[in-house]
């Protein structure tokens, strides 16, 4: 009963905060407010410069490899399982996929900054 009460309270509080943020938007946007601020001087360069596609691809690759490493973190606790061969095979499969994807990125020159 306490769990349901806590869950309902948190849900209602989250919904209330979401409704308040939609009802009270910042509508007074003007040119001076949307310009970048550099210590009171006029900006030296535009603030909305697009970043390179190479950086974006490296960032996405990092996120994917980080996710795969996070999947490997519970392996020490998984060694205590009753079905050890299945756990070893699945971990070897995951490590193989990680190594093959790294080799593919390397061969496609996805990790090289110089062109």
Swiss-Prot record:
Its EC number is 7.1.1.2. It catalyses: a ubiquinone + NADH + 5 H(+)(in) = a ubiquinol + NAD(+) + 4 H(+)(out). GO terms for cellular component: mitochondrial inner membrane; respiratory chain complex I. It comes from the Eukaryota. Coiled coil: none annotated. Keywords: Electron transport, Membrane, Mitochondrion, Mitochondrion inner membrane, NAD, Respiratory chain, Translocase, Transmembrane, Transmembrane helix, Transport, Ubiquinone. It is a multi-pass membrane protein. The chain crosses the membrane at residues 3-23, 55-75, 84-104. One of its GO terms (molecular function) is NADH dehydrogenase (ubiquinone) activity. It is an enzyme of class 7 (translocase). InterPro entries: NADH_UbQ/plastoQ_OxRdtase_su3, NDAH_ubi_oxred_su3_sf. Its main location: mitochondrion. It holds the Pfam family Oxidored_q4. It is found in: Mitochondrion inner membrane. One of its GO terms (biological process) is mitochondrial electron transport, NADH to ubiquinone. The keyword Translocase applies. PANTHER family: NADH-UBIQUINONE OXIDOREDUCTASE CHAIN 3. Core subunit of respiratory chain NADH dehydrogenase (Complex I) which is composed of 45 different subunits. Interacts with TMEM186. Interacts with TMEM242. Belongs to the complex I subunit 3 family. Core subunit of the mitochondrial membrane respiratory chain NADH dehydrogenase (Complex I) which catalyzes electron transfer from NADH through the respiratory chain, using ubiquinone as an electron acceptor. Essential for the catalytic activity of complex I. This is NADH-ubiquinone oxidoreductase chain 3. The gene is MT-ND3.
């Amino acid at each position: 009963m306490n769990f349901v009460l806590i869950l309902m309270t948190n849900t209602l509080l989250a919904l209330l905060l979401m409704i308040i943020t939609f009802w009270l938007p910042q509508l007074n946007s003007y040119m001076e407010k949307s310009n970048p601020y550099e210590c009171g001087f006029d900006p030296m360069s535009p603030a909305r410069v697009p970043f390179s596609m190479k950086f974006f691809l490296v960032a996405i690759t990092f996120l994917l490899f980080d996710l795969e490493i996070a999947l490997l973190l519970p392996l020490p606790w998984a060694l205590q399982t009753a079905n050890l061969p299945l756990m070893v095979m699945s971990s070897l499969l995951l490590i193989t996929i990680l190594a093959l994807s790294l080799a593919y990125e390397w061969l496609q020159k996805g990790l090289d900054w110089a062109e």
